[in-house]
Amino acid sequence: MPFSNSHNLLKMKYSVDDEYPDLSVHNNHMAKVLTLDLYKKLRDRQTSSGFTLDDVIQTGVDNPGHPFIMTVGCVAGDEESYEVFKELFDPVIEDRHGGYKPTDEHKTDLNADNLQGGDDLDPNYVLSSRVRTGRSIRGFCLPPHCSRGERRAIEKLSVEALGSLGGDLKGKYYALRNMTDAEQQQLIDDHFLFDKPVSPLLLASGMARDWPDARGIWHNDNKTFLVWINEEDHLRVISMQKGGNMKEVFTRFCTGLTQIETLFKSKNYEFMWNPHLGYILTCPSNLGTGLRAGVHIKLPNLGKHEKFGEVLKRLRLQKRGTGGVDTAAVGGVFDVSNADRLGFSEVELVQMVVDGVKLLIEMEKRLEKGQSIDDLMPAQK
């Protein structure tokens, strides 16, 4: 748990060598960047809310690596963190986001009409489609650093705003503290709710403090539009449904997200955003669009093929296990989504998923017949 602010002056009594973390066995982006010299340069800085370098890196110190994905190993505690600790964050962002430079500008496109196709992904292979993003409310600290009062204020504000949604987005808020364990587990199993805070990344960064205080889920009546409140980000906005109509999912996502932003503005709150980093979120891996468009897809043959990883890489896609980031694939079902978040617009990322998934299905059909997929190998996108 972060506690460095109160101890930062105490730490200064010890030399840089005494305080520098042992990163010798680490495989994360932070550990690649944080040299002794950089630690020395940044260790006495803090943001105006008191977030320090040790708060930024603690999750990456405590979690050397991950078997399935290269983790980032650092978090922001407020909007200022990305500026105050830019000498650490900029190279991490460049490394994680495919060479995104400190001078680059991000683009946003939430017009679902610009998406080509996507309403006809084969439902025999695509079990469900989902698009999610995160949003942070300007003026509050982020989850690794916010106080109980801030968290409760974010919950109150969000529930009031979401309560104004109408039509097929009309819904209700369910606070975690009012749910039984069984109700919570059912929502988790149905992929509607975030897991209980057992992930070491959540725990070490301090995001799980005071759990389940001021956490909850808001969803519309048919559970196709959901908002998680106060998990890894202030808000996680999710549009999802069974089958392969990604166009419908993305259209609902854009409509709902735009309405939510308007409702917050009417209360004089805006989302954290800047021209360079796009939407500001807790984890540097989610900067930019914060968008992950994913499908649960059955690929029992391609999933075992030696070229599966290379195909995904060329399509700028990534795979996760069936149950999400910390899990393995079950029954040949993978969670396949865009690998990028920053430097591409929302429409461009969903387009990559739609086009890529069509090719994956074509390859799977070939392999079912025992045929080669060599001529289908895509060029690098």
Swiss-Prot record:
One of its GO terms (molecular function) is creatine kinase activity. ATP binds at residues 128-132, 191, 236, 292, 320-325, 335. Keywords: ATP-binding, Cell membrane, Cytoplasm, Kinase, Membrane, Mitochondrion, Nucleotide-binding, Phosphoprotein, Transferase. The gene is CKB. Reversibly catalyzes the transfer of phosphate between ATP and various phosphogens (e.g. creatine phosphate). Creatine kinase isoenzymes play a central role in energy transduction in tissues with large, fluctuating energy demands, such as skeletal muscle, heart, brain and spermatozoa. GO terms for cellular component: cytosol; extracellular membrane-bounded organelle; extracellular space; mitochondrion; plasma membrane. This is Creatine kinase B-type. The modification Phosphoserine is found at S285. It catalyses: creatine + ATP = N-phosphocreatine + ADP + H(+). The modification Phosphothreonine is found at T282, T289. GO terms for biological process: ATP biosynthetic process; phosphocreatine biosynthetic process. Its EC number is 2.7.3.2. Its main location: cytoplasm. Ba-CK and Bb-CK are phosphorylated. The N-terminus of BA-CK is blocked. Dimer of identical or non-identical chains, which can be either B (brain type) or M (muscle type). With MM being the major form in skeletal muscle and myocardium, MB existing in myocardium, and BB existing in many tissues, especially brain. Residues 11-98 form the Phosphagen kinase N-terminal domain. It comes from the Eukaryota. Pfam families: ATP-gua_Ptrans, ATP-gua_PtransN. Residues 125-367 form the Phosphagen kinase C-terminal domain. It is found in: Cytoplasm, Cytosol; Mitochondrion; Cell membrane. Coiled coil: none annotated. InterPro entries: ATP-guanido_PTrfase, ATP-guanido_PTrfase_AS, ATP-guanido_PTrfase_cat, ATP-guanido_PTrfase_N, ATP-guanido_PTrfase_N_sf, Gln_synth/guanido_kin_cat_dom. Expressed in almost all tissues and found enriched in various region of the brain, retina, heart, gizzard, gut and sperm. Belongs to the ATP:guanido phosphotransferase family.
